[in-house]
Amino acid sequence: MKTAVIQFPGSNCDADALHAARLLLDDGAQFVWHTETALPEGTELVFLPGGFSYGDHLRSGAIAARSPIMNAVKAHAEAGGYVLGVCNGFQVLTEAGLLPGALSRNKELHFMCKPVHLRVENNATDFSRAYGPGQIIEIPIAHGEGNYYADAATIAELEEGGRVVFRYADNPNGSLNDIAGIVNERGNVLGMMPHPERAVELLLGSEDGKGVFESLKTVKK
């Protein structure tokens, strides 16, 4: 699956994202700088990595969501192309309107960096088919603003539509309904705060993140 990893000023998980993509999806995966106005021809997956884009000025992801490349990312998503936003990438997706809700300060008001357990809430998406229903997986988090919030109507819509893909088994940040990752209505855009790209090799402590990439690899073109 041809993959483009978007780089914003302040991205710091872009190399991890590229490594995971090259290891599991596309050995020719490449970086795309935020000032570009088009994605590489044939791009199938856009990966928005974690970090502190633009120093988190205004709000996390707010400026990055208005970068030139995001017009192409939106068009890609609207055409049915896959988009994966991790951590700051999830924040960018909400700021860009590609996913509902917002990510606010952690309930403890400090940065958290540790492995957490997630429950696979919906394994029928193109991002989660490699997992079993209800499977508990270990994926690291690293964020200060990962507390997912949306109004009651939006939360109900997410829950009723099976759009909560990953849920915290032991909520670390105060996210409503223990939400760790959601998809859009069409199912081609996933945002999640935990970092699957940091859990693709046993050397890193867990291989449980591989399922996200292995799921995408099974998508029929």
Curated annotation (Swiss-Prot):
Q: Which SUPFAM superfamilies match?
A: Class I glutamine amidotransferase-like
Q: What is its EC number?
A: 6.3.5.3, 3.5.1.2
Query: What is its biological role?
Result: Part of the phosphoribosylformylglycinamidine synthase complex involved in the purines biosynthetic pathway. Catalyzes the ATP-dependent conversion of formylglycinamide ribonucleotide (FGAR) and glutamine to yield formylglycinamidine ribonucleotide (FGAM) and glutamate. The FGAM synthase complex is composed of three subunits. PurQ produces an ammonia molecule by converting glutamine to glutamate. PurL transfers the ammonia molecule to FGAR to form FGAM in an ATP-dependent manner.
Q: Where is the Glutamine amidotransferase type-1 domain positioned along the sequence?
A: 2-221
Q: What is this protein called?
A: Phosphoribosylformylglycinamidine synthase subunit PurQ
Would the keyword RNA-binding turn up in this protein's UniProt record? no
Q: Which residues form the active site?
A: 87, 195, 197
Q: Pathway it belongs to?
A: Purine metabolism; IMP biosynthesis via de novo pathway; 5-amino-1-(5-phospho-D-ribosyl)imidazole from N(2)-formyl-N(1)-(5-phospho-D-ribosyl)glycinamide: step 1/2
CDD domains on file:
GATase1_FGAR_AT
- The UniProt entry lists the main location of this chain as cytoplasm
Could you name the domain of life of the organism this protein comes from? Bacteria
What subcellular locations does the record give? Cytoplasm
Q: Matching PANTHER family, A to Z? A: PHOSPHORIBOSYLFORMYLGLYCINAMIDINE SYNTHASE SUBUNIT PURQ
Q: Which InterPro entries match?
A: Class_I_gatase-like, PRibForGlyAmidine_synth_PurQ
One Pfam family matching this protein: GATase_5
Q: Name one GO cellular component term.
A: cytoplasm
Keyword hit for Nucleotide-binding:
yes
Which GO biological-process labels does this protein carry? 'de novo' IMP biosynthetic process
Q: Which reaction does it catalyse?
A: N(2)-formyl-N(1)-(5-phospho-beta-D-ribosyl)glycinamide + L-glutamine + ATP + H2O = 2-formamido-N(1)-(5-O-phospho-beta-D-ribosyl)acetamidine + L-glutamate + ADP + phosphate + H(+); L-glutamine + H2O = L-glutamate + NH4(+)
Give the multimer and partner information.
Part of the FGAM synthase complex composed of 1 PurL, 1 PurQ and 2 PurS subunits.
MF terms from GO for this chain are: ATP binding; glutaminase activity; phosphoribosylformylglycinamidine synthase activity
Alphabetically list the UniProt keywords: ATP-binding, Cytoplasm, Glutamine amidotransferase, Hydrolase, Ligase, Nucleotide-binding, Purine biosynthesis
Gene3D superfamilies (alphabetical): 3.40.50.880
